[in-house]
Regions:
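Phosphate/pyrophosphate-binding catalytic cores of soluble transferases and nucleic-acid-acting enzymes
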Residues: 1-204
Length: 204
């Protein structure tokens, strides 16, 4: 069961109420709350709320570590395996990650921190990352908009890690759909009320 909504929509408070009513535990699918050092913008539950209701994927990464859909998938599978409750409530604003998890992810190369740094340095040195991607893998470049820097970067990470054109790598490593069915619920909030809520949060 997943509850999604933008920052300031009230999903965190609602998730606490639902978890209490349903006797559930909470998995935080949030690209900010997963970091130990980020607290204000992420609207993490209080220590008291966490004491009463078990939360997963909070304060997991240091600020210099990267999060991605593959990491959240691994953490979600771990949480489902060890949770003591019948219901695990997935809560967050990262609908992109949830969509990626549900549709399926390909296995990605396991890299050391040193290898990650080296690859990042090589990609940063490119004058035109999209043009380079087009030169090594026209098929993959055709599927990605030139302004989609995230997907371009991910494709180049695959290339530098495997020395294989990304389209060939994904053909050999097809997506694996998520093994569990998840019911989705989304919160809809008036835009002005949402902006006011976010302003108030950042003042505190």
């Amino acid at each position: 069961m997943a509850l999604l909504g933008p920052s300031g929509s009230g999903k965190s408070a609602l998730s606490i109420e639902l978890a209490q009513e349903l006797d559930a535990e909470i998995f935080s699918l949030d690209s900010l709350s997963i970091y130990k050092e980020i607290n204000i913008a992420s609207a993490k539950p209080s220590l008291k709320e966490r004491k009463n209701i078990k939360h997963y994927a909070l304060d997991y990464l240091n600020i210099d570590e990267k999060n991605n859909a593959s990491l959240f998938k691994t953490l979600l599978e771990d949480a489902m395996r060890i949770s003591q409750k019948k219901i695990l409530l997935i809560v967050g604003g990262s609908s992109f990650y949830l969509k990626s998890i549900l549709e399926g992810l390909s296995d990605t190369p396991k890299l050391s921190n040193e290898e990650v740094v080296k690859i990042e340095r090589e990609i940063s040195a490119l004058a035109n990352p999209y043009a380079f991607l087009k030169s090594i893998d026209p098929n993959m470049a055709f599927k990605i908009h030139p302004n989609d820097t995230y997907r371009i970067h991910k494709a180049l990470e695959i290339f530098y890690a495997t020395h294989t054109p990304p389209s060939e790598y994904f053909k050999a490593n097809p997506k694996k759909p998520f093994a569990h069915a998840i019911s989705l619920f989304a919160l809809s909030v008036d835009k002005n009320a949402l902006h006011n809520h976010i302003k108030q949060r950042t003042k505190n």
